[in-house]
Design a protein with these regions (language model features):
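Short beta-strand segments enriched in small/hydrophobic residues
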Residues: 1, 38-54, 154, 162-170
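N-terminal helix-turn-helix/winged-helix DNA-binding helices
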Residues: 24-57, 61-63, 72, 95-97
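Central regulatory/effector-binding core of bacterial HTH transcription factors
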Residues: 67-111
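Short beta-strand elements in bilobed, periplasmic/extracellular small-molecule ligand-binding domains
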Residues: 69-80, 185-217
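Flexible loop/hinge segments that line or gate small-molecule binding clefts
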Residues: 106-150, 166-171, 243, 269-281
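Hydrophobic alpha-helical segments within soluble ligand-binding/sensing domains
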Residues: 140-166, 182, 186, 217-226, ...
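An alpha-beta-alpha
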Residues: 151-193, 198, 313-332
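Flexible loop/turn connectors
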Residues: 221-340
Length: 340
């Protein structure tokens, strides 16, 4: 490595150099292209890590990111990890040689790579749109416990005392999902209704296969069908996100149950389809496109700071931004039906 990279602070005999170069040629080794400091400053590429592109939530984040990048004359390259550790690791290994102007994670990095992510962040501006507390990098935070609590409080205020929460797999890798469920359950526990919430989560296999365009919709649909085959006393169902909520609604309507007359439904994310008049889904707004814009804004500030004539004397800032979630009441929630 030192021979091929022509390290200035070490020396080797001509014979050694020739042997190494000959071996490298025979093996087909190609020395990675190096960027000079000058060229690296001219990089106009922002890399975005996404776990999936099948949920409009991530498309909304990308729109926010791209709107700022375009304004500033930057391009955006999306790395779809498909929630697979191997793919995420491959992309991370590419980052030093790609040397983008900035990197944005639209979800929590896998804990196995957090050290690597923090190391990259020391050299390249990097922002995480996350729910992980105490990350040592710039982050757009979201309190998912508060989101779950807000969903539960709305249903409690409408008199729902037997409810279900439907979610994708609640694994250690997806802690933001678990926190949303925990916030929901704790709100019911405060009212002495610890046994009022039924949690139905998809099997872990859902996160291990390549997601299809309707994966989360099918989780909502399938688990609601399963729930209805087991019991009919539930008066409200919460979906971890809006796509799951759409599946819940279709499963209920297939069983001739009215929404919200028989069963209320609430989602989260306020994606574009939730606002359409025929759907009109009650949901939680947490300002997804603005999070994307903020993440890209932070990258731009870091780039400008690094290019400043006074960059060596400026303090290093870590940005943490959080939006307060907001309940959006529409037509899929109503007062709990009375027992007959």
């Amino acid at each position: 490595s030192m021979v091929l990279n022509k390290k200035y602070n070490v020396s080797f005999s001509r014979e050694t150099v020739e042997k190494v170069e000959k071996a490298a040629k025979e093996l087909g080794y190609v020395l990675p292209k190096r960027r000079s400091a000058k060229n690296s400053k001219n990089s106009r590429l922002i890399v975005v890590f996404c776990p999936t592109l099948t949920n409009p939530y991530y498309v909304m984040l990308l729109q926010g990111i791209e709107s700022v990048a375009k304004e500033k004359g930057y391009g955006v390259f999306t790395c779809n990890t498909q929630r697979e550790l191997k793919i995420e690791e491959q992309y991370l290994r590419m980052m030093p040689s790609v040397a983008p102007a900035g990197i944005i994670y639209t979800c929590n990095p896998s804990s196995a790579f957090m050290g690597q992510v923090e190391e990259i962040a020391e050299k390249i501006p990097l922002v995480i749109i996350s729910n992980r507390e105490r990350v040592r990098v710039d982050a757009i935070n979201q309190d998912n416990t508060k989101v779950g609590s807000l969903m539960a409080r709305h249903l409690l205020d409408l008199g729902h005392r037997k409810v279900a929460f439907i979610a994708p797999p609640l694994t250690k890798r997806q802690q933001q999902r678990s926190r949303r469920v925990e916030g929901f359950v704790k709100e019911y526990e405060k009212e002495g209704l610890a046994d009022a919430v039924i949690i139905k989560a998809a099997d872990d296999i859902w996160d291990e296969v390549l997601p299809s365009i309707d994966s989360e919709y099918r989780i909502g649909y399938n688990l609601t069908r399963e729930l209805l085959s087991e019991r009919r006393d539930v008066t409200a169902i919460a979906g971890l996100n809006d796509m799951i909520a759409f599946g819940i609604i279709d499963a209920l309507q297939e069983e001739k149950l009215k929404v919200p007359g028989d069963v209320s439904v609430i989602g989260c994310d306020n994606i574009i389809f939730s606002r359409m008049s025929h759907m009109s889904l009650t949901t939680i707004e947490h300002f997804v496109p603005l999070k994307g814009r903020d993440a890209c804004d932070i990258i731009m500030r870091k780039i400008e700071s690094a290019h400043s004539a006074y960059s060596e004397t400026q303090p290093t800032s870590i940005y943490h931004i959080e939006y307060e979630p907001k309940l959006i009441v529409r037509k899929t929630t109503g007062y709990a039906r009375q027992k007959k």
